[in-house]
Amino acid sequence: MYLFRNKFVALLLVITPKSFWPMKKLSSLFSLFLLIPLFAVASEVGDRTIPAEVAQLADSLKQKFAPDKRVALFDVDYSFSGKNVMLRGVTTSAEAKTALLDGLAKKGYAVMDCLQVLPDEAGLEGKTYGIVNVSVCNLRVAPDFSSEMMTQGLMGMPVRVLQRDGWYRIQTPDNYIAWVHRVGIHPVTREELTAWNNAEKIVVTSHYGFVYSQPSQASQTVSDVAAGNHLKWEGTKGAFYKVAYPDGRQGYISKSISMPEKKWRATLKQDAASIIATAHSMMGIPYLWAGTSSKGVDCS
């Protein structure tokens, strides 16, 4: 049986006057009240040892729905008090959660369900997408600057936002799930992402450069840029393109280090000679674990 999604629901049931509830529901509510202390025990001092039958169920579901933790999550924390169990943690698969709840119920467990399915729509206030907002952002295993780096994101790259906890937990276009510092992306709604994707872009073609506040390299810089960065094309002025960032900032980038995306795509060559020439152009760029940008490149 599935009882409460969180403690607050249980607390609400306890403090609500009985006069509010129809008499025919009082007996069932009384039964629920009797179970609340059991879940409280499971929450605070519950046994974290997972019974073999539950471990087997969890392992089978993880293999089915999240075999590669880099691209799918099934991180469940269990707290037991006899046949009562509280579930905490996160998963990216609603199917996996349903299968877990069904499996536990069939084995006779009463479940307090606090397992969260990502993306966290409510916590993100509808902004379940994002756009990389800096030249290169580092994506990490955990929400900490000392955590191992998984990969990198380039300015203009769309991502799926799964969770916010100081940092953002995101999923990249190639399905990697990682944490990024909040300044690295600009959260948007689905509609805002569609507008960004449909806008004409300017692509940075040089390994490194800058966007300026005015169409002059003597003006204040807005930010740096790196090869492969995408900016919204707002117009042209002399030797510069006027561009906009995902967060709305504007500036000017030299035509000598960038070009319209459509033109860039038309000139791409994917033959062996062109790929080797591009690789040679990056000789001397520093090695960086999980680096995928012109600021630092991994060996792979």
Over which residues does each language-model region extend?
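Bacterial Sec-dependent N-terminal signal peptides
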Residues: 1-45
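A short, polar/charged loop/turn motif at coil->beta-strand junctions and beta-hairpin connectors
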Residues: 126, 130-133, 197-200, 205
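N-terminal capping segments
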Residues: 47, 51, 55, 63-72, ...
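Beta-strand-rich, non-transmembrane domain signature
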Residues: 77-82, 101-105, 112, 116-129, ...
